[in-house]
From Swiss-Prot:
Record protein name field: Energy-coupling factor transporter ATP-binding protein EcfA2
Principal location class: membrane
PROSITE patterns documented for this protein: ABC_TRANSPORTER_1, ABC_TRANSPORTER_2, CBIO
Family: Belongs to the ABC transporter superfamily. Energy-coupling factor EcfA family.
Molecular function per GO: ATP binding; ATP hydrolysis activity; ATPase-coupled transmembrane transporter activity
Oligomeric and partner information: Forms a stable energy-coupling factor (ECF) transporter complex composed of 2 membrane-embedded substrate-binding proteins (S component), 2 ATP-binding proteins (A component) and 2 transmembrane proteins (T component).
Keyword presence, Protein biosynthesis: no
Topology of the protein relative to the lipid bilayer: Peripheral membrane protein
Length: 289
């Protein structure tokens, strides 16, 4: 399903002395099957926006259309439960949401809550364990006996067990080491492709945004300031800097290489693999002279 965000505003604690405008005039269209990264500084409104996508927050102005479902300011939505099954959110440190006595029960909890039989829910839980790279032998263990990275995978499996059409990731690699971060991000990308998910990544990492997303949405001080593909946006270095954002390390490397060698690459280098390929091509070109 496509997601259309139209003139959305959200104010916290409305009509109190503590009223605060969090986001305003937010407009965006996210196509079914796309991988979109929402980037911006802390406090830019990224997390507030994502909580609107399954009705955890409702707009105080404007509307969000998710397929046939519409979340609109001032109107009740009778189908929030069904919507929350379609839109799964993986929050920062999702392992903090684990609570059951066994891994199998924890993953099966959501499907059972949505009406699936226990037998089918546990079968689904075993399938999701395998999908996130954990063995079936762990199913009867307490989730609190696992490593931090394994606990995170169990929590992610619990979201995937709901079979969402849209997967929203709020800083999903927070607190992980570089290896763990890459493993988790590669896993999400693989799931995105295999299951034709619409994936929305909220991140501070310009590297992850550049490497995985089809499109970027830049939030700044509560509203959308820029949209485009990673190559389009990261080629506008001055605009990115003006929004207080850093460039991916690969583009910083590209810039140093261009300054040192007096050359200009045709397009921004977004991944380590692209950087390695460009450097290899430079050496081959030099050796051919």
């Amino acid at each position: 399903m496509d997601i259309e965000i139209k003139d959305v505003e959200h104010r916290y604690q409305m009509k109190t002395p503590f009223e605060r405008l969090a986001i305003y005039d937010v407009n965006a269209v996210i196509k079914e099957g796309s991988y979109v990264a929402v980037i911006g500084h802390t406090g830019s409104g990224k997390s507030t926006l994502l909580q609107h996508l399954n009705g955890l927050l409702k707009p105080t102005k404007g509307q969000i259309r998710l397929g046939e479902d519409v979340l609109e300011a001032g109107k009740k939505n009778k189908h929030l439960k069904a919507l929350r099954k379609k839109v799964g959110i993986v929050f920062q440190f999702p392992e903090h949401q684990l609570f059951e006595e066994t891994i199998l029960k924890d993953i099966a909890f959501g499907p059972i809550n949505f009406g699936m039989s226990r037998e089918k829910a546990e079968e689904k839980a075993r399938e999701m364990l395998k999908l996130v790279g954990l063995g079936a032998e762990l199913s009867d263990r307490s989730p609190f006996e696992l490593s931090g990275g394994q606990m995170r995978r169990v929590a992610i499996a619990g979201v995937l067990a709901m079979e969402p059409e849209v997967l929203v990731l709020d800083e999903p690699t927070a607190g992980l080491d570089p290896r763990g971060r890459k493993e988790i991000m590669d896993m999400f990308y693989s799931l995105h492709k295999q299951r034709n998910l619409t994936t929305i990544l909220v991140t501070h990492s310009m590297e992850d945004a550049a490497a995985y997303a089809d499109e970027l949405i830049v939030m700044h001080k509560g509203t959308v300031k820029a949209k485009g593909t990673p190559r389009e946006l990261f080629s506008r270095k001055d605009d990115i800097a003006a929004l207080g954002l850093d460039l991916p390390e690969t583009i910083k490397f590209q810039k140093r290489l261009e300054e040192t060698l007096g050359i200009t690459f045709k397009a921004p280098i977004l991944t380590i693999e692209e950087a390695a390929s460009e450097v290899k091509a430079l050496f081959q070109e030099e050796n051919a002279l």
